[in-house]
């Protein structure tokens, strides 16, 4: 039953992504998976389906709505004794809203919030085992002693600034923070961006 539900969910995602949208709007699907780098532990997977839409009252504001799922596993993922885990099994299913506001042609900030759930309701165990079954042909993970099922709330903030080096070559930086019941963190991302730099990051 769980496999059928997950396959249906993936089919709907594919349909949404391939559906043509107005050029002023955008749908993105981002997938993180550490098996791309031949490993599968700690931050194991992330799936993010996002919908972007300019604010109808101010074209310099961008609204983003994201449905996402995060999956974390211990390094010894086939170990059945939770006392030997170096990290708990954990899944997080969430809905996130952010509003990004333009500050200049190369900078912006965003504020937002996130509501989600951990535990069985996150669907993480089923999603990970389905991927292992269909794509990798690996045995199912037991998911012993996973993080309990609880409602989670987070506040989000970020600041983006781009620096033009020369035509179509730019440095980017983004300072971001999360504060709430699921995550408390802050970080700085730096990058090299090839293309026309904008305030969107």
Locate each region found by the language model.
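Bacterial Sec-dependent N-terminal signal peptides
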Residues: 1-26
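Residue-level signal for the start and early helices of compact helical domains
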Residues: 8, 12, 58, 62-63, ...
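Residues in flexible loops and secondary-structure boundaries
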Residues: 9, 13-14, 37-39, 57, ...
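Short loop/turn segments at connectors of secondary-structure elements within structured domains
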Residues: 17, 23, 59-61, 105-109, ...
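N-terminal ordered "arm"
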Residues: 24-62
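Outer-membrane pore/translocation modules
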Residues: 27, 67-201
